[in-house]
């Protein structure tokens, strides 16, 4: 079970993708007090975990029984969103800027907790991990990934200050390319599952 938890936590961490959250923190650090940014990070990750917990426990019921959405369709949608985010990072060397708020904590739930932390890719992963390994592995892996994400975001408050903006832009573009590849793979996997499902019914 330990190996399943660790591999699942790695998958969830990739789906959450702390890299763009770290960039967000560096941008917010320039305009807001560091203590406010810390509070934002903690609140956003708690909210993000609770959202993923809901989908890990009851996501299949919510999606398939209520909305009649198949997991493969969600994989395609999540992959498309990831591909789009990666493409934006690759082209611009940055992420879409968030409209400034007078109260930074207003950003904790939306857009930081969702869709940045608990986005389509992470939600898909939570549901898929529950289906494949069970609720204990899925929730534990999600918790580990969220803790790592929160720690990286908090550390970036201090580490990102000395990084050259040009180097940061290049790094973001490279990360964007990998995000695009992950998104493309998710879309291919989801589309393949949809095709197989259609062939079985035919």
From Swiss-Prot:
The membrane-topology field of this record reads: Multi-pass membrane protein
Name the GO cellular-component terms. Answer: plasma membrane
What's the domain of life for this entry? Archaea
Which positions are tagged coiled coil? none
Q: What is its main location?
A: membrane
Detail the disulphide connectivity of this chain as listed in its UniProt entry: none
The compartments listed are: Cell membrane
User: Which ranges does the record mark as transmembrane?
Assistant: 5-25, 47-67, 76-96, 104-124, 135-155, 174-194
The entry sums up its family as follows: Belongs to the UPF0056 (MarC) family.
Name of this protein: UPF0056 membrane protein PYRAB02000
**Which organism does this record belong to?**
Pyrococcus abyssi (strain GE5 / Orsay)
